[in-house]
């Protein structure tokens, strides 16, 4: 039987890098962004709809369906330990813990909010992708394309929901969530990975940090509306702009309030 765990956290905080490194372990499979979380949420929606008309033992049937989906979603993967990647597993722990055969565990990547916002904006400027989803939204709202407006939109619609899910999991189930801070991962990768292995209760592994294969890349990356969103560098390094230079000192002060 496979053991199902989860990979969550904030966008632009190293989840693709961490997943690719964990995939080097012979016992671990880390997925790209997965639909499993949406499938689980969809099951609840369907049960709420059919419960009005149909007569059935909802408690028993719910258990059968949820537990079967969670147990069998990755039957085609030969590795015994699965980490399913989705930003919103934190807020889904209430449901998952009732139907999972093992204790739920989330590995959550984290980075300071100003750095996350800066990473998004730097990627836009670096790729010169004019039709990226952020600027498209600003145009539709007749807002000027400025880094200040970009930062506000990114936070409100893309970072805050993931942040709230992560905070929910940390607050309600602290023993089930392990945080991996981006800068620590880049500076001391093996040390951070060993902590993850210990948290997942699996044997340690000596990782390789050169010619890293992007094992968690998104085949449909263009559907995310920004080229290179899930690219990683083959050799472990940090090349980041100073948030003050990108979003300004005042925005750094505002968004730093949300840092853990």
Label the model's feature ranges.
Residues 14-19, 37-40, 90-93, 114-119, ...:
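Short catalytic/ligand-binding loop motif for oxyanion handling, primarily in non-cytosolic enzymes
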């Amino acid at each position: 039987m496979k053991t199902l765990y989860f990979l969550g956290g904030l966008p632009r905080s190293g989840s693709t890098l961490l997943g690719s490194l964990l995939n080097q372990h012979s016992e671990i499979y880390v997925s790209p962004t997965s639909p499993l979380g949406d499938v689980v949420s969809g099951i609840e929606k369907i049960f709420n709809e059919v419960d009005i008309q149909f007569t059935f033992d909802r408690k028993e049937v719910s258990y059968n369906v949820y537990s079967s989906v969670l147990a069998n979603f990755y039957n085609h993967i030969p590795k015994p330990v699965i980490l399913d990647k989705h930003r919103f597993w934190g807020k889904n722990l209430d449901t998952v813990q009732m139907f999972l055969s093992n204790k739920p565990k989330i590995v959550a990547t984290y980075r300071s909010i100003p750095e996350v916002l800066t990473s998004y904006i730097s990627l836009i400027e670096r790729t010169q992708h004019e039709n990226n989803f952020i600027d498209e939204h600003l145009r539709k709202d007749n807002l000027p394309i400025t880094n200040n407006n970009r930062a506000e939109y990114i936070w409100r619609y893309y970072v805050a929901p993931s942040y709230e899910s992560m905070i929910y999991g940390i607050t309600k189930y602290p023993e089930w969530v392990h945080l991996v801070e981006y800068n620590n991962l880049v500076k001391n990768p093996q040390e951070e990975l060993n902590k993850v292995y210990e948290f997942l209760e699996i044997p340690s592994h000596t990782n390789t940090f050169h010619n890293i294969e992007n094992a968690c890349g998104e085949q449909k990356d263009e559907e995310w509306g920004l080229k290179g969103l899930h690219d990683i560098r083959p050799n472990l390094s940090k090349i980041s702009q100073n948030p003050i230079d990108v979003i300004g000192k005042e925005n750094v002060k505002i968004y730093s309030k949300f840092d853990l």
